[in-house]
UniProtKB/Swiss-Prot annotation:
Coarse class of the protein's main subcellular location: cytoplasm
Pathway terms, separated by semicolons: Amino-acid biosynthesis; L-leucine biosynthesis; L-leucine from 3-methyl-2-oxobutanoate: step 3/4
Gene Ontology MF terms: 3-isopropylmalate dehydrogenase activity; magnesium ion binding; NAD binding
This protein's name: 3-isopropylmalate dehydrogenase
Cofactor note: Binds 1 Mg(2+) or Mn(2+) ion per subunit.
Taxonomic source organism: Staphylococcus aureus (strain MW2)
Enzyme Commission number: 1.1.1.85
GO BP terms, alphabetized: L-leucine biosynthetic process
Top-rank taxon: Bacteria
Entry similarity comment: Belongs to the isocitrate and isopropylmalate dehydrogenases family. LeuB type 1 subfamily.
Catalytic activity: (2R,3S)-3-isopropylmalate + NAD(+) = 4-methyl-2-oxopentanoate + CO2 + NADH
Location relative to the cell: Cytoplasm
A matching Pfam family: Iso_dh
Keyword Transit peptide: no
Lineage: Bacteria, Bacillati, Bacillota, Bacilli, Bacillales
Length: 348
């Protein structure tokens, strides 16, 4: 079997971290004996510059045919038209592929807890995953309008939309430490009242998983005061957007966090959670670990290569533990150095 992978380098540091990761994929495929082919497509701001829109039909159709999609990063201050922004291409891609589940693991690597802005004893060994609903909620709700006197956004969830994301979270929790925290604003929002009701109903199908409910403001506090209490967190789109960014800084850098977005069937999208960092683009100083860890998720989930994913992750964790990092993590290596060291380790 030959896997079909679509590469979307995007903007800013996206091309350099994605292209380096693809060089690692070539080494890994030879080592673990699997075949793949790559289609490169412009996306985001780069696509706006070339084609006038962030996501062309050609690119979208290629993504629909793919087994997996690897995305570098998109966006930047260059693209200011509110009706034609790079981020709108990503929203359209998620909606078109029905990528309703976003998985964001956050791990504090052994020996790297000193990098965290929190006290080491609070974060040592922290390992949690946030499961975020990605294609409904206030980002997609209708009606919506904006003028100089009034603005309206709509927050809507159906039972089916809640059930499908909650099942993903329960299954993930069952495969880990068996604890699920559901986050809502049930004390004031009608959508959250339905959310909590559905979570309680679905929980009956997963007796091996312990469930607790937290209001979103309480959860944001506990992520800082006691992050190690969490295993899997599930939440709606807006809450997940905010909480996952909060959680991602606990290891010490946004550059350490990967993510995966998927539907019940069809291709999955893998990307680091950080932005395009246009201020450092092309300077060979970007931290590529988030992108490489996203590649590891792709190897495990879409390319059926769990051993390769484990090896790649372990090499990264060992590098971080021994201070072989870029400057944002206190190290002295540049982007190219990271890829060269990992290439040597994988070829060993």
């Amino acid at each position: 079997m030959t896997y079909n992978i679509v590469a979307l380098p995007g903007d800013g540091i996206g091309p350099e971290i994605l292209n380096g990761s693809l060089s690692l994929l070539e080494i890994i495929s030879n080592k673990y004996n699997f075949n793949y082919q790559i289609e490169h497509h412009e996306f985001g701001g780069a696509s706006i510059d070339t084609f006038g829109e962030p996501l062309t039909e050609k690119t979208l159709n290629a993504c629909k045919r793919a087994d997996a999609i690897l995305l570098g990063a998109i966006g930047g201050p260059k693209w200011t038209d509110p009706n034609n922004r790079p981020e709108q291409g990503l929203l359209k891609l998620r909606k078109s592929l029905n990528l309703f589940a976003n998985i964001r693991p956050t791990t504090v690597v052994k020996g790297a807890s000193s990098l965290s802005p929190l006290k080491e004893e609070r974060v040592e060994g922290k390992d949690l995953v946030i499961v975020r609903e990605l294609t409904s909620g206030i980002y997609f709700g209708e009606p919506r309008h904006f003028n100089n006197h009034e603005a309206l956004d709509s927050l809507t969830y159906t039972r089916e939309e809640i059930e499908r994301i909650v099942h993903v979270a329960f299954k993930l929790a069952a495969s880990r430490r068996g604890k699920l925290t559901s986050v809502d604003k049930e004390n004031v929002l009608a959508s959250s009242k339905l959310w909590r009701k559905v979570v309680n109903e679905v929980s009956q199908l997963y007796p091996e998983v312990t469930v607790n409910h937290l209001l979103v403001d309480a959860c944001s506090m506990h992520l800082i005061t006691n992050p190690k209490q969490f295993d899997v967190i599930v939440c709606e789109n807006l809450f997940g957007d905010i909480l996952s960014d909060e959680a991602s800084v606990i290891p010490g850098s946004l550059g350490l966090s990967p993510s995966a977005s998927f539907s019940n069937d069809g291709p999955r999208l893998y990307e680091p959670i950080h932005g395009s960092a246009p201020d450092i683009a092309g300077k060979n100083v970007a931290n590529p670990f988030g992108m490489i860890l996203s590649l590891a998720m792709c190897l495990r989930e879409s390319l059926n290569q769990p051993d390769a994913a484990d090896e790649l992750e372990q090499h990264i964790y060992n590098m971080i533990e021994h201070g072989q990092t870029t400057a944002d993590l206190g190290g002295k290596l540049n982007t190219t150095d990271i890829f060269e060291i990992l290439s040597q380790k994988l070829n060993h």
